[in-house]
């Protein structure tokens, strides 16, 4: 065990807003909902560069998002525009797992892998 495992990961409170993404929709139509291409465009959150620094992560790192008892791991992407305290997620199973939008949540770095869509679907059924 590493010493870092005992330390709490820094968190950042954010408001999450969802949006439709044309590239994600195209990947779904071209490759299917269960494809890696679709997951790579869907299981993401766009964060402000300042928020990334607060939680000690960089573009492409996995993050855990927690909201009202629900949680999901997605890939953090650095936004080109400044919007501190606001995270943007494409409309998908990964964003829907967190609840009704806009939703208040905390985001922190994660060591876990991004769950596949079939894993998320089975989690929501059980």
Question: What does each of the following model-derived ranges do?
Answer:
Residues 1-47, 51-126:
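Long, contiguous, secondary-structure-rich segments that constitute the structural scaffold
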């Amino acid at each position: 065990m590493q010493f870092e495992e005992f330390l709490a990961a820094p968190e950042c409170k954010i408001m999450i807003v969802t949006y439709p993404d044309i590239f994600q929709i195209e990947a779904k139509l071209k490759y299917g909902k269960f494809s890696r291409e679709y997951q790579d465009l869907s299981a993401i959150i766009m964060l402000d560069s300042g928020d990334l620094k607060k939680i000690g992560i960089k573009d492409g790192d996995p993050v855990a998002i927690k909201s009202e008892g629900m949680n999901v791991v997605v890939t953090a992407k650095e936004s080109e525009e400044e919007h501190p305290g606001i995270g943007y997620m494409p409309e998908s199973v990964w964003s829907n797992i967190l609840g009704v939008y806009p939703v208040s949540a905390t985001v922190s770095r994660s060591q876990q892998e991004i769950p596949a869509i079939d894993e998320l679907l089975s989690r929501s059924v059980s």
